[in-house]
Design a protein with these regions (language model features):
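Metal-associated gating/positioning segment near the N- to mid-region
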Residues: 26-95, 99-100
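Polyanionic/metal-chelating signatures
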Residues: 79, 84-233
Length: 288
């Protein structure tokens, strides 16, 4: 038996029941823990899909770490109820993949609340959405802006991280001064873009990287090593099986579809065994 009180499991086993307890016979069925959706756009692309309510991509600049997905979440999105019926009790809301650096993601509990603050999962760290490949170069190349190529993508990431390191060094230099010295000069001005990137460099914000092709994942790891941050997971990762050992060696997870691919060029080279290959890489040290 499983005892639930106030929507939470409070006991499992042989449980004496109160006479007023509601009993549901689920013999022959599966009971699982709540499902965590690790890549969601619920709330920022709510149903019905209207342009006036589509707030997941700030596609005005390829680098927008200053925007936060939680500031777009519509807490009345009917998709939340449908997801709950499917067993999803927690979900990670990310900005879309139009930008090289798309903004902060947030982890929410699937509970009713008028405010997004009331839905936040306690203690969950912020994340940062990055995207490589077709989407950024298509969105901005189509506007005759940089990036329009994959090498333009990489240049954009590197410029952003160089600026972040400069800002981080200024903050460290100021904090290293004595109290007397601090009184004689101003602290570095707040910069919303660079604050988020420095949060990544300081290990407080976790990178979630939209990426399909194997060689591009390897390039993103090269950039991470150059600037001293860690990629937590590659999302979609259609070709992760090609670099499974590299991902395992670097402690990087892959968040993948089990059976969906082929909907655009970079999503063609998939194998059914993708998730299994990544999970079992290097003697079972992979993460999928």
């Amino acid at each position: 038996s499983i005892l639930m009180e106030n929507n939470k499991i409070t006991a499992i086993g042989e449980i004496p029941l109160d006479t007023d307890a509601k009993v549901i016979d689920v013999k022959g069925k599966w009971i699982t823990p709540g499902i965590i959706d690790i890549h969601s756009h619920m709330g920022v692309y709510p149903a019905p899909g209207l342009r006036s309510n589509s707030d997941g991509n700030e596609a005005t600049n390829p680098v927008t770490p200053h925007v936060w997905a939680e500031h777009s979440v519509w807490t009345h999105d009917p998709q939340f109820t449908l997801a709950l019926k499917g067993g999803i009790t927690t979900f990670h809301v990310l900005p879309g993949s139009a930008n090289l650096i798309g903004g902060r993601g947030v982890t929410l509990k699937n509970v009713r609340s008028v405010t997004v603050q009331g839905m936040k999962f306690p203690g969950a760290p912020y994340t940062l959405k990055m995207a490589c490949g077709e989407n950024p170069k298509r969105v901005y190349g189509g506007k005759n802006k940089e990036p329009s190529t994959r090498m333009g993508n990489v240049a954009g990431y590197r410029k952003a991280w160089i600026n972040a390191q400069d800002y981080q060094n200024k903050l460290k230099e100021y904090e290293s001064k004595s109290d007397e010295a601090k009184e004689l000069e101003y602290a570095p001005s707040r910069d919303l873009e660079l604050e988020t990137l420095v949060g990544v460099l300081d290990g407080e914000i976790l990178i979630q990287n939209h990426c399909y092709r194997g060689e591009e994942m390897a390039v993103m790891l090269d950039i991470a090593k150059e600037f001293g941050y860690k990629v937590t997971a590659f999302h979609h990762a259609i070709e992760a099986y090609k670099v499974a050992d590299i991902l395992a060696d670097n402690g990087v997870c892959a968040a993948m579809w089990a059976d969906w691919w082929g909907f655009k060029h970079e999503a063609f080279d998939m194998v059914w065994e993708n998730a299994a290959i990544v999970d079992q890489a290097n003697g079972g040290k992979g993460c999928a």
